[in-house]
């Protein structure tokens, strides 16, 4: 995995964890959890691609991996919409920068997962 992506994930998660958005902090915690889950999924998919022979064990271990892949894309789309919404409503420049970076990272991760999945199919 690209070290810039790793540091981007870590930076975004750290910055988001420092934000306090009042009554919506539960929503923010949910977003942070989904970011962490997405990072783990992307990492495991990338490792499977690197080991190319691992596609068979991936399919055997989880016969519904394509369904899981579809769910991850839905999560990414939800996160993109949520981040866009937060970006529109916040007036704090620190939060705006964080959400803009999170949005860019989501687009990059979505593209990477698409690339990995095409290599696995």
UniProtKB/Swiss-Prot annotation:
Q: Do the record's keywords include Secreted?
A: no
**Ranges spanned by the short sequence motif Nuclear export signal, renumbered to the chain:** 12-21, 85-94
Q: Which UniProt keywords apply?
A: Host nucleus, Host-virus interaction, Transport, Virion
Q: List the disulfide bonds.
A: none
Name a GO CC annotation attached to this entry.
host cell nucleus
**GO annotation terms (biological process):** exit of virus from host cell nucleus through nuclear pore
Which one Pfam family would you cite for this protein? Flu_NS2
Localization, UniProt: Virion; Host nucleus
Question: In its keyword annotation, does this UniProt entry include Nucleotide-binding?
Answer: no
Q: Which residues form a coiled coil?
A: none
Q: What InterPro entries does the entry give?
A: Flu_NS2 (IPR000968)
Q: What does this protein do?
A: Mediates the nuclear export of encapsidated genomic RNAs (ribonucleoproteins, RNPs). Acts as an adapter between viral RNPs complexes and the nuclear export machinery of the cell. Possesses no intrinsic RNA-binding activity, but includes a C-terminal M1-binding domain. This domain is believed to allow recognition of RNPs bound to the protein M1.
Family note: Belongs to the influenza viruses NEP family.
Q: How does it assemble?
A: Interacts with protein M1. May interact with host nucleoporin RAB/HRB and exportin XPO1/CRM1.
Protein's recorded name: Nuclear export protein
Q: Which organism is it from?
A: Influenza A virus (strain A/England/878/1969 H3N2)
Lineage at the top is: Viruses, Riboviria, Orthornavirae, Negarnaviricota, Polyploviricotina
Report the gene name: NS
